[in-house]
Amino acid sequence: MAKIVKVIGREIIDSRGNPTVEAEVHLEGGFVGLAAAPSGASTGSREALELRDGDKSRFLGKGVLKAVAAVNNEIAQAIVGKEGCAQSEIDQTMIDLDGTENKSKFGANAILAVSLATAKAAAASKGLPLYAYIAELNGTPGVYSMPLPMMNIINGGEHADNNVDIQEFMIQPIGAKTLREALRIGAEVFHNLAKVLKAKGLSTAVGDEGGFAPNLASNADALACIKEAVENAGYVLGKDITLAMDCASSEFYNKENGLYEMKGEGKSFTSQEFTHYLENLCKEYPIVSIEDGQDESDWDGFAYQTKILGDKVQLVGDDLFVTNTKILKEGIEKGIANSILIKFNQIGSLTETLAAIKMAKDAGYTAVISHRSGETEDATIADLAVGTAAGQIKTGSMSRSDRIAKYNQLIRIEEALGEMAPFLGLKAIKGQA
């Protein structure tokens, strides 16, 4: 066993040019873990707090020196001397020291960076790859799978400066036999989509997550462009590739009148009408997964949507559940959605993240491991997806090195594990096995 001897926090830059927190945890024996906190654009109101300085003279108020100071002072003083492998104890120490419901004293960005850096240092001290150590922490040592990628190839909503209301249009290469093959298929469709958009005189500029961000007449147009790209790449939509969407509905939900206002299309829907709008898209295209298909507070709308679509479509709660076991437990009891999106920084520690994945799986929900729109070269989510055998991962498109870092780490892991980590493909998606 190796004790923590030093903790260092620093301000680094994320993929959107904003500061974020990086933590370095040193153990006895010279073992070091380095981790950075990601940052979201479309955020759930009940997420753990990302602490920003608010000093307009630095980074337009988005500096994180307060969170870094918490790492270097209070957090460091509290955990130096503790065993590096005592992950849950270290996480709980930080949570208790913060003392707030949403980690607003130190910031979830500070606590998470230290939590993940600790896990990396501990894995190194045990001579284990991070995914193997995560599997041990998860209580499932040696149980792995390679995740099916949800590849966000058209960006809209808060992730792009365009008129497309739905935030993410994704492809899932279900016909692949391996993760590496899935990435090849995704790349081929991505490049063909660029050609399709250019031929239509549309922009091939990319959004925060590496997908294209053209102005389109409708959400159905985005799906039609993807269909054309899939076919041009030589694949069959529905057989080789299925589709997924992240509506991020809270971003266009008007709380005053209770309507979903899709300004890009000039349409407004009631809660039930929006479910049927999505249902019609699912009839026209092989959409097998929909994320945040209602506003985070519209639980009646989610219940109706689950009743209408839940037996044939994976309904993923992101802003709905915010990786929080208290909220997820209530959702499970009420039969809301059937899957959860897992984002480390929504809850703020590795221990709490693993608890959310376990609760979801125990209830028959799927868990989709996810990046944020503001990312770094940190690829921990790749190891999390494999080490928990989650089955699915969302980490952007086939461009931007902050996204590709995760895919490349998955390639390395698949190579190392071979048959020990099966690629589940379509079977990983709720309702599709």
From Swiss-Prot:
This is Enolase. It comes from Haemophilus ducreyi (strain 35000HP / ATCC 700724). InterPro entries: Enolase, Enolase-like_C_sf, Enolase-like_N, Enolase_C, Enolase_CS, Enolase_N. It comes from the Bacteria. Disulfide bonds: none annotated. Its main location: cytoplasm. One of its GO terms (biological process) is glycolytic process. Its EC number is 4.2.1.11. SUPFAM superfamilies: Enolase C-terminal domain-like, Enolase N-terminal domain-like. Pfam families: Enolase_C (PF00113), Enolase_N (PF03952). Component of the RNA degradosome, a multiprotein complex involved in RNA processing and mRNA degradation. GO terms for molecular function: magnesium ion binding; phosphopyruvate hydratase activity. Signal peptide: none annotated.
